[in-house]
């Protein structure tokens, strides 16, 4: 049936034709209803939830923050097949975690380790790195162990050893961070002039966190966030195609991720690493069923644009 038209008279005598019925963009609610109808047509029903009290995704040797980060780092690229072109990207990716992954790892027990985390940050054993606001990770931060942090600074000192001014700046910054490990710094605490701070920001060592507050970052942090964005997007798209946007754990682990890697020529994190991230970031819920642990895309995960 043709669309109905409405003719409006303007002051200058011109006419304007409005369509009373036009094709509108579907809302998330409409998409959800259509998805449910499609699932009903296949004869499938939602998974039967037994409990939201689920066992940990990763078994920890001990439940210290340091050990938790070490175990998560071990899972970063476990059981992931990638093309040769992505190996360089993986090699350059700093070994760190998203802070919210600890929520996905400990879940209801996270509050018991949060105080230990803050203490480790104050002593400098763990560094909190802030993600750039231009990335799609608003308010998120990463955690890196002191040995990995020092190793990366050593790499950049070697890289700029022939550029005296830059080398001196990086050396002074690293020394300051060792002697005074804080989550963020004022311009007075940094002891750099404006030109030096601006250079460190442009190189990726600092980010402006507030009016007079600077957070610590790293130049190759963008590689980590790039792979993280790919991993979140891949998991979200996979669950969106599933009936009721949910999947049993065993089916998820058996998925051949190498197919996606070959098509997109991109790197992805390992399944347990990305699931801890997705749960901690509120993109996915986990629950127990008669068939074992399962995961379901949340409203936040459905609406998030990567």
UniProtKB/Swiss-Prot annotation:
Catalytic activity: L-seryl-[protein] + ATP = O-phospho-L-seryl-[protein] + ADP + H(+); L-threonyl-[protein] + ATP = O-phospho-L-threonyl-[protein] + ADP + H(+)
Source organism per UniProt: Schizosaccharomyces pombe (strain 972 / ATCC 24843) (Fission yeast)
Similarity-based family: Belongs to the STK19 family.
Single GO cellular component term: nucleus
InterPro entries per the UniProt record, alphabetical: STK19-like
Enzyme class of the recorded protein, top EC level: transferase
Top-rank taxon, per record: Eukaryota
Any Pfam family the entry gives: Stk19
Protein name per the record: Serine/threonine-protein kinase mug51
Disulfide bond annotation, renumbered to this chain: none
Record keywords: ATP-binding, Kinase, Meiosis, Nucleotide-binding, Serine/threonine-protein kinase, Transferase
GO molecular function: ATP binding; protein serine kinase activity; protein serine/threonine kinase activity
Coiled-coil stretches noted in the UniProt entry, renumbered to this chain: none
Record function comment: Serine/threonine-protein kinase. Has a role in meiosis.
GO biological process, alphabetically ordered: meiotic cell cycle; positive regulation of Ras protein signal transduction; transcription-coupled nucleotide-excision repair
EC number: 2.7.11.1
